[in-house]
Amino acid sequence: MNVSAIVVEYNPMHNGHLYHIKKTKKLTNCDALVCIMSGNFVQRGFPSILDKWTKANMAISNGVDLVIELPTLYSLSSAEFFSFGAVSILDSLNIINSICFGSEIGNINALQDIATTLLEEPLEYKILLKNYLDKGISFAKARNLALVELNRDNKIMSENINKILSLSNNILGIEYLKSLLLLNSSIKPFTITREGADYKDENLHEEYSSASSIRKYLKENKNINILKDFLPLEGFLEFKRLITKGYNFSMEDSMINYIRYKYISGYKNLHNLIDVSEGLDNRIYKSLEKNFTYDSLVGEIKSKRYAYSRIGRILCQYFIGFENYDLNSLLKSTPNYMRVLASNEMGLKVLKKIKKHSSTNIYTKLPKNTNTLLSLDIKATNAYSLLNNNIRFNEDYFRSPTIIKNTIY
């Protein structure tokens, strides 16, 4: 059985994601497609607009065979750890033949060359990186500038690196490749050229509109029919059903009062979070005293060194309670389990193959004794239940994977 994998967030699923699924199947000629997906919180530091079980069901209805949850520790981490968490889980299954991700450049060799350089970190690169960081430049930008200067004698290469590293999906793709190299994985990487609007584009203006534009529309409008052209049919019908039921779409602003209340209640332990350094905690505390929306709060805190998404992740981690965990130790380890959120009949065959070839623990229901990584997922869902009244406290203990039969793809 030829099994391919994709790493996704689906916040929410749109036509660009359906394109990714179809192109992956065509490019890899796979018999089955496994998806590892962020749960109730996503990498930019937002609560997911839909709960993880609803997202997983949509994925199965649109061509994925098996959906595995990416632990919250990784889904709310930098691109480096986000990628490593996903790839390490996939590699541990011992049955994944390939992984396919979208990128702006669509050239696997160019991305592979940069990934190799970043992983090996030659001395000159380290010195250049430190010099830029010392100037107060964000890590992502400093890395970009260091690589450009490292290749200053090769004008074409230098210009290409600058272009590649200025685009988010290229950066994430490089991190997937670094993780594969680090793990000495046999999984073969593929990339497809990303289609449609940039993820920051908040306008609905083409077939492949961004997830940001869809979230913005849902936040401001009630006429779901406008989104019919931008969502897969099954996803559009599910959204209509959810709206009819009075489903509560979770938006980032819904976290703010909980975060502010936590701060004024005396929980001033942001310094325990990995991404918080150099007095950033005090900067955040001061901003919490006078900002009442997510955008205004993050907008006041962010700087050249601290990017918008990094601040968003810090706020999300604080909301959930990451500061009470030994994050350094957790991030240095690799997950020893996979949690199934949804499957179809082909996905069940994939699960049988995993059981035969891998020693990783497969969870369809939560075990009596949960490890630290899994307990953090449970805590995240409980925090999410404050934002989404369709999700109960301890929902993780009540839910089993959905098995969907006779999908059309």
Swiss-Prot record:
It is an enzyme of class 6 (ligase). Keywords: ATP-binding, Cytoplasm, Ligase, Nucleotide-binding, RNA-binding, tRNA processing, tRNA-binding. GO terms for biological process: tRNA modification. Gene3D superfamilies: HUPs. InterPro entries: Rossmann-like_a/b/a_fold, tRNA(Met)_cyd_acetate_ligase. Its main location: cytoplasm. Catalyzes the formation of N(4)-acetylcytidine (ac(4)C) at the wobble position of elongator tRNA(Met), using acetate and ATP as substrates. First activates an acetate ion to form acetyladenylate (Ac-AMP) and then transfers the acetyl group to tRNA to form ac(4)C34. Belongs to the TmcAL family. This is tRNA(Met) cytidine acetate ligase. It comes from Clostridium botulinum (strain Hall / ATCC 3502 / NCTC 13319 / Type A). The gene is tmcAL.
